[in-house]
Amino acid sequence: MITKADKNATRKKRHARVRAKLTGTAERPRLNVFRSNQHIYAQVIDDVKGVTLVSASTLDKDLALNGTGNIEAATKVGELVAKRAVEKGVKEVVFDRGGYLYHGRVKALAEAAREAGLQF
């Protein structure tokens, strides 16, 4: 019998393949995105030290959001993570889409981060 592949397991495999090629350094850390049904999370990570430099999510109290699982919320998270990263002196990052397609909420977060000052 043919079984349907688990989407999250497929995403994790795709993410592992991409992560084998992507690393964040102190000069150019990695902007990681995690998306759930209700929320979206973004972290700027220095993989050499294994340290999260800045993070933002739809759970932050700084963001007054009506809905948290939509493109508008992802845009605000992108702006916030970029603002916090620029304040810490990070201007360039490597974008890690977390195995998700570059579409919808992931794309909105990335474009908002670019407009707010991050380069990738």
UniProtKB/Swiss-Prot annotation:
BP-aspect Gene Ontology terms: translation
One Gene Ontology MF term: 5S rRNA binding
Keyword line: Ribonucleoprotein, Ribosomal protein, RNA-binding, rRNA-binding
Ribosomal protein found in the keyword field: yes
GO cellular component, one term: cytosolic large ribosomal subunit
InterPro entries according to UniProt: Ribosomal_uL18_bac-type (IPR004389), Ribosomal_uL18_bac/euk (IPR005484)
PANTHER family registered for this protein in UniProt: 39S RIBOSOMAL PROTEIN L18, MITOCHONDRIAL (PTHR12899), LARGE RIBOSOMAL SUBUNIT PROTEIN UL18M (PTHR12899:SF3)
Family to which this protein belongs: Belongs to the universal ribosomal protein uL18 family.
Subunit (UniProt): Part of the 50S ribosomal subunit; part of the 5S rRNA/L5/L18/L25 subcomplex. Contacts the 5S and 23S rRNAs.
UniProt-recorded name of the protein: Large ribosomal subunit protein uL18
Gene that specifies this protein: rplR
